[in-house]
Amino acid sequence: MNQSLLSQFGTSEERVKRAIEAFKRGNGVLVLDDEDRENEGDLIFPAETITVEQMAKLIRYGSGIVCLCITDELCQQLDLSPMVQNNTSINQTAFTVSIEAAQGVSTGVSAQDRVTTIQAAIADNAKPQDLSRPGHVFPLRAKKGGVLARRGHTEAAVDLASWAGHKPAGVICEITNDDGSMARTPEIVEFGKKFNYPVVTIEDLVRYASNK
């Protein structure tokens, strides 16, 4: 990871603390994973507080695949089965079946509809019948143990939400460049400065979690 670029966002510990503070306020955070993994940056918001405006930003600047990162317990509560029985994904990304709110949405694609779906999924007494399948929100099952168990954006989202005092759920989307290519560290740093988002790495989060 290009530490010289990241140093403008503080030390590793400072970057994590700023990310947690942003989450506490319901703001977004940019999370970079390892260069030898996906080498991508995701914009992540706490699911509990995500707004239509924030969702619109994810859709506009991201890949369009908006994912809801949740715990295994919530997946079981909602009866969300894996998207496939045999996961051959290189990074073992744990997609479940996609979802839509059973009520209060039209086509399910708009920013408002996706926020409605997320709110339905993470509601305190959410039930399987509160969701239709398939839909336009893609749940991801976080590994128990968070980033210490798997160095993924999924686990980063759930950990950040928990550390900030929110429900353990986050909304993520990979940031793309204007030409459709994936944004790497230099572009993510510029994006963070432009929109005033903290930038943190998975390695930062692992270090922080190890010392908790």
Swiss-Prot record:
Gene responsible for this protein: ribB
Binding site for D-ribulose 5-phosphate: R37, E38, D42, R150, R151, G152, H153, T154, E174
Listed pathway(s): Cofactor biosynthesis; riboflavin biosynthesis; 2-hydroxy-3-oxobutyl phosphate from D-ribulose 5-phosphate: step 1/1
Entry annotated with the keyword Magnesium: yes
Keyword Repeat: no
Protein's GO biological process: riboflavin biosynthetic process
Cited HAMAP family: RibB (MF_00180)
GO function terms (MF aspect): 3,4-dihydroxy-2-butanone-4-phosphate synthase activity; magnesium ion binding; manganese ion binding
Protein name in UniProt: 3,4-dihydroxy-2-butanone 4-phosphate synthase
